[in-house]
């Protein structure tokens, strides 16, 4: 499991990092916390978004981490996952689009992805879970929005969260969906999808941009791992 930090997040721990580490010990998986290139400009952002298939700097970095860890540990290559927070969440959708031949699933909080991604070809299969506060003041939940008012024009318009969930449901040709509310959280599930994946969303009615300790009564780190752990590629 690779956990990608948010903007300016390289200076501190990943949210619930101690809990992720403890869970990894119990569940026998490896979690790694990549640090972005500190020399990038504010307009570029710590993680490159909406990169074409020929622009693979961060993707190569993610794969290199997995390859290096595989030289030391016994890793099941069919069970590679990514999570992230904010900008790190946005980057997990680069992995979902461009590294789905290796990674099986992504689950993250408070990100989005471009409305028109440069490259998003399904060579493997990709399960997606996204958690988001509906009162998020940085990453708009309900509407498409322009990335930093044109500072990084290569990224383009970013998707609303409902639009992004629909994108992945269509990408995996999901044939069924259902939803329910619990503790001010809307839970949407798209299933009967290609490759037996699921596309899930937790919309937190009263939450903003900060990483939540719990989602609908379940610790966030546990919810993320419970989802990811269902899938292999």
Regions inferred by a protein language model and the residue ranges of each:
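Alpha/beta-hydrolase
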Residues: 2-4, 109, 204
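Short, proline-enriched alpha-helix->beta-strand connector loops that line the catalytic pocket
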Residues: 122-128, 195-199
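Primarily recognizes the serine-hydrolase "nucleophile elbow" in alpha/beta-hydrolase
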Residues: 70-72, 77-126
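Active-site-adjacent alpha-helix of alpha/beta-hydrolase-fold enzymes
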Residues: 134-198, 214-218
């Amino acid at each position: 499991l690779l956990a990608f930090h948010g903007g300016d997040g390289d200076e501190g721990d990943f949210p619930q990092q101690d809990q992720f580490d403890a869970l990894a010990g119990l569940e026998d998986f490896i979690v790694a916390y990549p640090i972005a290139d500190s020399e990038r400009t504010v307009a570029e952002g710590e993680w490159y978004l909406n990169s074409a298939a020929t622009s693979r700097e961060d993707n190569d970095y993610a794969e290199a981490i997995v390859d290096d860890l595989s030289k030391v540990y016994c890793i099941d290559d069919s069970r590679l996952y990514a999570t992230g927070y904010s900008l790190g969440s946005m980057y997990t959708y680069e992995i979902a689009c461009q590294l789905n031949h290796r990674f099986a699933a992504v689950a993250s909080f408070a990100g989005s992805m471009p409305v028109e991604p440069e490259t998003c070809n399904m060579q493997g299969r990709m399960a997606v879970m996204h958690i988001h506060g509906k009162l998020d003041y940085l990453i708009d939940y309900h509407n498409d929005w322009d990335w930093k008012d044109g500072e990084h024009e290569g990224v383009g318009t970013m998707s609303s969260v409902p639009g992004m969930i629909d994108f992945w449901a269509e990408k995996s040709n999901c044939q069924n969906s259902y939803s329910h509310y619990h503790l001010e959280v809307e839970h949407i599930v798209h299933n009967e999808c290609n490759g037996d994946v699921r596309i899930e969303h937790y919309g937190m009615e009263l939450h903003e941009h900060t990483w939540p300790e719990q989602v609908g009564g379940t610790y966030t780190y546990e919810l993320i791992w419970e989802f990811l752990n269902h899938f292999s590629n």
